[in-house]
Every structure is written in structure tokens, then in C-alpha cells.
Amino acid sequence: MERENPQPPPVEGKAGFSGTKDGIQSSAVEQALSGLRQDIDAIDAQIVSLLADRQRVVGRVAALKKSHNLAVYHPAREEDLISRRRQQATHTGLNPDFIEEIYRTIIRRSRVAQTGSMALKSVRSDGIVLLVGGKGGMGCYFQACFRRAGYQVRILDKENWPEVQSLCDGIDLAIVGVPIDVSCEVIRSIGPFMPAKAVLCDITSIKEQPLEEMLKAHAGPVIGLHPLFGPTTSSLDKQIIVATPGRDDNACQWVLDQFATWGAVVVRSDAREHDDIMGIVQALRHFATFAFGQFLKRRKISLSRTLEFSSPIYRLELGMVGRLFAQDPSLYSEIIFASEARRNLLKDYIQSLHENLEMLENGNKCLFQKEFQKITEWFGPFGEQAMRESTFLIDKLIERF
């Protein structure tokens, strides 16, 4: 039977001894790391505590604004704060862009908190609001907004139209929020029941024709509104509402003040300018997105497979396409087919695509580059702004996904 050879004791420089030394070093490193991590945890706890202190002060700011009917959004104050924090970051050796990103998030949460508080604020005590078409998405949204602020809210829909006279009695504001194709008919129908001093407004995505009908139907204050957000919006903070004047701006001002108090940004425009711009901002953009999605579907493209190969910008663009098709098609058909002017605009867009066929068929790279350069010059400084903003969005997308 063979005898086992005894193992020699570890000698300095041999594997066994160096392993023991490495173990000692590793333990020391872990202890050092543990101490540093405890320091970081303590600092993080202080940061959270300070943010809680800040939020309590924000609550007092909200209460003060609420008592004096001041708007939540104060852009000059926010930009001044960001500028000072960037300077402080530079002086202390921190990246100012990093600090700006943190503070924009903090400021946003502060505004949302203030907006939540201001949602309970009414600029017209004991006001009565009638929502015409109040059972739709936006009708339900505004119903919640006005009720939270203490207004008496009445709903007028198809089912209770016989009660129109009693529902209109004593109201301060009527908001018409019905499909575009019936908005003018509804406006004409409700006009005779409006109290003389009540404000009549609509919230459709076209303004020229409904505004004209409201001015005919009601002799009192008239204003056109277009909320550029949907019923799933969680907060009115910095949400845009376009206001197109109709009659007696002073009498209508309290309506705009109410939305501003809730955190919205009111943009003023005449009806024609609004409709021209919305043709591009909404109709053309939604139709182009629809066409892209339709093309992908017809080519039977595997969306999941393309995402495996995708750049962040493609994921962002595909996300916008998917977002469109996750919503109500009737809403977008109303926007796209709202007027003959919009349909003509979209036909011009399709024609402009056909004009590029010859360039593609001939493989004319020079023409493409010339057109590209012309468009670059036309975009001007916005090109650099777009690059910065889209880079920020891409970075956020990478962080999250």
C-alpha cells in the first residue's frame, strides 16, 4: 500500500501563503468599503431629510399662493434658482449639468405638490359650471377639477337634454366638450338658454368655426379654449391651454385665471392662427405617425426584433408610434379629418413625398444632400436646440431601459 506524501508547510512566496495574504488584504478592503458605504448611507439619509424639510416649506409657499390667487408656475424664479445652483456646483467641483438635472426634478415635484394643493382653490366662490358633454373623457376630467375646487358642477348630455333650461339657470360658465362634427350644432342649441353674463366656451381642437358659432349663439362673454393634453393627465402643471378671444375678455378672464391657478400655462392666439398651427402640430404629426405604423404593419415587421437592433432614438420614435395606436382611434380621426383645410394640408404632404420618388429612383445623393443642407439652414438655431433636447431624452431612456 502506497504511503501518502505529506504536504509541505506554506512558504512565503508560494501559492498557499500568498493566498492567505490576499485574504487578509481582501478583508481589509471590505472593512474600508463598509465604512465608506456607511458614510454614504448617512449622507443619503441627510439628503432625504433635507428634501422633506424643503417639501414642508413648499407646502407653506403653496398655502401663501393659494390665499393670494398666485400662479404655481414662476419661470423667472425657477431659472434663477437653477442658475445659482449651477454656479454653486462649479465652485464646489461638481458637474453643473448633473446638479441642474437634480434640481429640475426637485422643482418639478414641488410644482406638482403645489398644483395638488391649488386644485382645491377656486377663483370664483360659489361658481356654477355646466359641462356640455360632461360624460366624455375631457368632460370627466374637468368635472373632477372644478368639483375639487369647490364649484357646483352640472352635467348636460344627450340623455338629459330635456333639462337644458333648468341646468343652464344661474350658471357662470358653460364648457362645450363634444365631438367636433357636432360641436357647432350643440353650440347653436344651447345658446338660447345661456344667462346673459355667463361665459360660453368650447374645448374642441379647431377654433375658427366653433368660435364663430358661439358669437352668433350667445350675446354674452365668449372664449375658445383648446387644452393640449388628454384626460389621463395626472397634473395640470405646465400643461398648455390655448385661449382664443371671442367677446368681453375681462368677463372671461376668471376662467383663464382658474386654469393658471391650477398650474396650466395659457397661450393666447386668434382662431385662424390656432387652426393653422394645429394643422401642423396635431393633424400632420398624427397622420405621419399613422402612416409609419400602417407601413410597418403592412410589411409585417417584427417590432420586438427591431428593438433588439435599435438605437435609443429608434426606440423613442417607435414608442411615439405605439403610443398613438394605444389610444382611441375616434379621437385621432376627429383631429385629422376636422376640416377641409386639414385634409388639404395632408394631401399636400403626401404629394411632397411623391416628389421625392424620382430622387430615389435615380439614386441622386447629390440632390438629397442639397435638400438636406437647405432644410438645415431653414431650421437654423433650432437644430442645435433639438440636438440637446433629444440627447437628454435619449440619455433618460438609456437610464430607464
Name these PLM-found stretches:
Residues 2-127, 144:
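Extended, charge-rich alpha-helical interface modules
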Residues 165-168, 173-214:
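Rossmann-fold NAD(P) dinucleotide-binding segment
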Residues 207-210, 214-265, 269-271, 275-278:
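Rossmann-fold dinucleotide-binding core
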Residues 141, 147-165:
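NAD(P)-binding Rossmann-fold cofactor-contacting core
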Residues 268-401:
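An accessory alpha-helical subdomain
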Residues 130-133:
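Conserved N-terminal Rossmann-fold NAD(P)-binding element of oxidoreductases
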Residues 53, 149, 262:
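Conserved dinucleotide-binding and phosphotransfer motif residues
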Residues 137-138:
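Hydrophobic/small residue at the entry helix of a nucleotide-binding pocket
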